[in-house]
């Protein structure tokens, strides 16, 4: 069985990398999240650093007596870090952050922040580089 690739399919994938991700805040307010490829070098580096910072937050041991306290602390930390990313990639970062901050529960708020970030990362994903011919 042979896989057939079309130029149109390639074109769609390539265009997707350059298109913003649109997040609806309300019926009449949307925020666009710029793709990584359209950011300047310093902004790209800051985004990558922030994502690494989130990934470096340690897992919480459920048996730890301070686990409940740590969950809230880590949740707030995640929101702070991801907000930095939104300030770099969003057309209206204050509106996006304000909408996410309406959630009072720090755990749910952190999950909302992470979901928006994850959606942006998936939708604008660069993918793996093709192996070089040898």
From Swiss-Prot:
It comes from the Viruses. Disulfide bonds: none annotated. Pfam families: GP24_25. One of its GO terms (biological process) is viral translational frameshifting. Keywords: Viral release from host cell, Viral tail assembly. Promotes tail assembly by creating a scaffold for the tail tube proteins. The tail assembly proteins Gp24 and Gp25 would wrap the linear tape measure protein to create a tail assembly scaffold. It would allow polymerization of tail tube protein during which Gp24 and Gp25 are released and therefore are absent from the mature virion. The tail assembly protein Gp25 is produced by a rare -1 ribosomal frameshift. The ratio Gp24/Gp25 is important for proper tail assembly. Interacts with tail assembly protein Gp25 and tape measure protein. Belongs to the L5likevirus tail assembly protein family. This is Tail assembly protein Gp24. It comes from Mycobacterium phage D29 (Mycobacteriophage D29).
């Amino acid at each position: 069985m042979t896989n057939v690739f079309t130029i149109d399919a390639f074109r769609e994938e390539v265009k997707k990398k350059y298109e913003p991700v649109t997040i609806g805040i309300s019926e009449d307010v949307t925020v666009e999240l710029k793709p990584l490829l359209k950011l300047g070098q310093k902004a790209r580096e800051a985004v990558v650093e922030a994502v690494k910072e989130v990934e470096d937050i340690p897992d919480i041991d459920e048996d730890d007596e301070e686990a409940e306290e740590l969950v809230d602390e880590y949740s707030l930390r995640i929101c702070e870090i991801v907000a930095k990313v939104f300030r770099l990639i969003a057309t209206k970062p204050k509106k996006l952050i304000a909408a996410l901050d309406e959630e009072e529960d720090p755990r749910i708020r952190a999950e909302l922040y992470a979901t928006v970030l994850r959606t942006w990362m998936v939708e604008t994903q660069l993918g793996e580089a093709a192996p070089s011919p040898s």
